[in-house]
């Protein structure tokens, strides 16, 4: 069994459901410390974070390449639906099964073993290798990567490149990498009306009827046209509720939850202003609470994307696609202190599902790609 596969199985065997790390980071720390990494555990409200650094011969003047990821996994769902226990690694039909196999314990193992192989061949490497690992990515993400980033900002730590081990591939390893992500902003809208008897609408104000024209306009609005890297911004309703449950009472208020997924072609302030303008135009009496869970980030083609594309092509023969589709990731936090952030990991077809798995044939090539990037950028 390869070293990467063995470490992957060791990590899968830990039931590290958010935010419980279950000593996964301790396993990684022991391996990294043996290589000469300075390892720091940063705990916050039950979340375990790891910042590990191995300086190169150029010291703080050298380039720093960070591997970022998460040890936490999503809940298993109904255990009886799993073909084999989710935290007992199992091999069937050329696949390794277990919760976290694809998202993202194989990537973590590949990071570690790639670093071990790189240091063995390049003991006097010039640049710096770092690990930024959290147990709070699948959950609220309030005490994980963002806390480490804030600490590094306070220390004046500079990251030049970061690879986030998210499962970005689709059919084959390396067919898709993410060089950016859209931002996410949600709104909680309450439109006020006057509750009344449904037979006497002139004595009431039905907030559903009041909201409907504005809702239609919001749904039809083209917020932007996107750009070279991002599709157009989208606005979607996730929840709409009003009424008491009775058939003869008009509601006193209508509650609407909505979400923007927005590109670098729009700003938070601009989108908020346009929503308020539409609501005000329709004369609504309302309250609106905003929450921004992530700003868009983008890494244009450059040193990191070039090194990763070359490593993937050399290892797999595949020409990769740069993409910004999908949801948010911890890359949105890391982009605050790192100009080049790219996500790359194994195929994502089984993530968060019953019988999550990874094809064993992808495990060592993933490690090899990570090692090749180290060789290109910091050797």
UniProtKB/Swiss-Prot annotation:
Pathway: Amino-acid biosynthesis; L-lysine biosynthesis via DAP pathway; LL-2,6-diaminopimelate from (S)-tetrahydrodipicolinate (succinylase route): step 3/3. The keyword Membrane does not apply. It catalyses: N-succinyl-(2S,6S)-2,6-diaminopimelate + H2O = (2S,6S)-2,6-diaminopimelate + succinate. Zn(2+) 1 binds at residues 70, 103, 166. It comes from Burkholderia orbicola (strain MC0-3). The keyword Nucleotide-binding does not apply. Its EC number is 3.5.1.18. Zn(2+) 2 binds at residues 103, 138, 352. Gene3D superfamilies: Zn peptidases. Homodimer. This is Succinyl-diaminopimelate desuccinylase. The active site is at 72, 137 (proton acceptor). One of its GO terms (molecular function) is succinyl-diaminopimelate desuccinylase activity. One of its GO terms (biological process) is lysine biosynthetic process via diaminopimelate. Binds 2 Zn(2+) or Co(2+) ions per subunit. Keywords: Amino-acid biosynthesis, Cobalt, Diaminopimelate biosynthesis, Hydrolase, Lysine biosynthesis, Metal-binding, Zinc. It is an enzyme of class 3 (hydrolase). PROSITE patterns: ARGE_DAPE_CPG2_1.
């Amino acid at each position: 069994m390869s070293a990467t596969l063995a470490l992957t199985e060791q990590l899968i065997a830990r039931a590290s459901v958010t935010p419980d790390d279950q000593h996964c980071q301790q396993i990684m720390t022991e391996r990294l410390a043996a290589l000469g990494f300075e390892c720091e555990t940063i705990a916050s409200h039950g979340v375990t974070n790891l910042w590990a650094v191995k300086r190169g011969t150029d010291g703080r003047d050298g380039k720093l390449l960070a591997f970022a990821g998460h040890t936490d996994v999503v809940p298993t769902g109904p255990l009886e639906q799993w073909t084999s226990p989710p935290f007992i690694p199992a091999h069937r039909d050329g696949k390794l099964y277990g919760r976290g196999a694809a998202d993202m314990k194989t990537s973590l193992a590949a990071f570690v073993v790639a670093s071990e192989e790189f240091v063995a061949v390049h003991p006097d490497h010039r640049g710096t290798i770092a690990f930024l690992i959290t147990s709070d990515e699948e959950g609220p993400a309030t005490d994980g990567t963002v806390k480490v980033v804030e600490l590094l900002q306070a220390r004046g730590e500079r990251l030049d490149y970061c690879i986030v081990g998210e499962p970005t591939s689709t059919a084959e390893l390396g067919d898709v990498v993410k060089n950016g992500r859209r931002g996410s902003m949600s709104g909680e809208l309450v439109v006020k009306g006057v509750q009344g008897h449904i037979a006497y609408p002139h004595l009431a104000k039905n907030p559903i009827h009041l909201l409907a024209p504005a809702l239609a306009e919001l749904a039809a609005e083209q917020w932007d046209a996107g750009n070279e890297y991002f599709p157009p911004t989208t606005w979607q309703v996730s929840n709409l509720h009003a009424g008491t449950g009775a058939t003869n009472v008009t509601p006193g208020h209508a509650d609407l939850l909505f979400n923007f997924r927005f590109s670098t072609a729009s700003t938070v302030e601009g989108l908020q202003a346009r929503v308020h303008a539409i609501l005000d135009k329709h004369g609504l009496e309302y309250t609106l609470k905003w929450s921004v869970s992530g700003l868009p980030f983008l890494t244009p083609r450059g040193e990191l994307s070039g090194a990763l594309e070359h490593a993937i092509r050399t290892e797999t023969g595949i020409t990769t696609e740069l993409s910004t589709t999908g949801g948010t990731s911890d890359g949105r936090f890391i982009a605050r202190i790192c100009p080049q952030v790219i996500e790359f990991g194994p195929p994502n077809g089984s993530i968060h599902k019953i019988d999550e798995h990874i094809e064993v044939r992808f495990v060592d090539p993933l490690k090899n790609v990570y090692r090749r990037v180290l060789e290109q950028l910091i050797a």
